[in-house]
């Protein structure tokens, strides 16, 4: 049985691996799509959640809306993009935050991310 990984994007963007050569993706989204596809090649089951309207599978990665995350699924790893508050949406054995920017304490407090960061 393959391990299950979920990636939860905190942005309001709607995208999938089909958009990798388009204009809407930034570096973080592109990096995570490529990482997801590599994980799939290694035998992992990958769910990728953002604001996408319709579920689709692209290059082995299942994309669906983060509002439709099933908390009864126990993932082996949950990766949240920059916001530990996203972990409240999911059940997982391990959690990791993917952030490409510096998070000063002020920003953690302002965006109410400090407690979830320490909690998860």
Question: At which residue positions do the language-model features occur?
Answer:
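N-terminal subdomain of nucleotide-sugar transferases
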Residues: 1-49
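Extended catalytic core of nucleotide-activated donor transferases of GT-like folds
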Residues: 50-120
């Amino acid at each position: 049985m393959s391990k299950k990984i979920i990636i939860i994007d905190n942005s309001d963007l709607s995208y999938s691996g089909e958009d990798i050569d388009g204009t809407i993706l930034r570096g973080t989204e592109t990096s995570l799509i490529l990482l997801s596809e590599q994980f799939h090649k290694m035998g992992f089951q990958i769910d990728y959640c953002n604001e996408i309207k319709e579920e689709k599978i692209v290059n082995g990665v299942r994309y669906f809306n983060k509002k439709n995350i099933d908390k009864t699924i126990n993932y082996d790893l949950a990766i949240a993009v920059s916001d530990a508050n996203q972990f409240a949406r999911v059940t997982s054995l391990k959690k990791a935050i993917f952030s490409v920017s510096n998070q000063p304490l002020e920003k953690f407090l302002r965006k109410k991310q400090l407690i979830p960061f320490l909690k998860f």
